[in-house]
Amino acid sequence: MDFIQKAAQTVLPGPDTSMLVITTVVTTASLYTILNRIIYPRRPSVLQNPLSSHISSLSPEEQSQLLYPPDYFPGARDVPTPYGSIRCYEFGPVSGRKVLLIHGISTSCMTLTHIAHGLVERGCRVLLFDLFGRGYSDGVGDLPHDERLYVSQALCVLASSELAWTGQGEEEGFHLVGYSLGGGIAAHLAATFPSTVKSLILLAPAGMIREENFGIVAKVIFRSGWVPEGIVEIMTRWRLKRPIAESAKRKSKGGPSGPSTPKSHLPGDQAIEATVTSEIADAAVAEAPGPLQRQVLKYVNWQVANHAGFVPAFMSTLRYAPMINQHEAWRKLAKREPKTTCFIFGIGDEIVNDEDYRQDVLPLVGGEENVFWARSVPGGHDFPMAHPDQTLERIWRFWGWDEGVAASWVKT
């Protein structure tokens, strides 16, 4: 019996050892749980926009001082949907030509400020909205931010209007303007509903950016899905907080091009660096960026700090959105009525290269006899903000509103 007791004491740990083992197991399990939640975060289906999480606590005076106040455009409304709330703005003459505008990846629809007001001045009825996870639209935490989600969002916005936007008759339907990522989304919307979209205007559109412009590092980090989402989020937050500094480095190394200088290609991962900041990249290095560009630059940082859905939406957009290899959708644009699709590019744009698009896209959409390939606008990827008058002149020409306007174009 004594032998058995001694054996048991030898095999079984004492009280101190047992406590150490238990503590180690509990600590390890806790650390694993914490790290797992950081590396593989579980997000709610709806990520609240700043209107409910931040803006509601501000006084009217404080709200008026925001970079993007809730009443930035006239006709603001919030549209409830199964995906969350969508902020949109509708203004201009009720009987005017209806124009839906879709903005790019980095900011709210404020990037299209000058274009929207210019259209209204010419008698158009405009409708803008903040893409999910930007501005005052909720973020979507449990779905990929691909063309299906964004086209569905646009349809929800159109359906929310008191006016009829989606008819297919000769005097019905709407005209569509897409900028950068918004151009890639607009191409899918027009390809799916060709008779509803009366004319399609693509401003430096994503969708057919050459895949080789995404370097190996960028592909692995942002698009492959191999890097844990939590780590990508940390890297993305860091990158989005530094657009001015990083773009200034690019300028000191010889890029990007000046406002009227023909664009050059950025190698590999530098191209994705520019794409990451998209609309704001050129504004950051401009010799004298305008008030809107400066405002947009600051607003990106504000979104990182105050919009729970912004960084997740940005990450998902880089991975899933229609930015490259959209050949199937773009081929459908060739079936549109001739000369109802317009392409406008910036001369110094290193992100969406008009020469690449001329080679890769023009054959897909039916050639120059089928589309309106406008003369390039001065400036880089931010040309709708930096050179709105020249951009609008191309639009008037496309619509046939000003036959003599070409003489007033800036020489390029």
Label the predicted regions:
Residues M19-D78:
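An N-terminal hydrophobic leader/cap segment in hydrolases
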Residues A191, T196-G230, T261:
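Flexible "cap/lid" loop of the alpha/beta hydrolase fold
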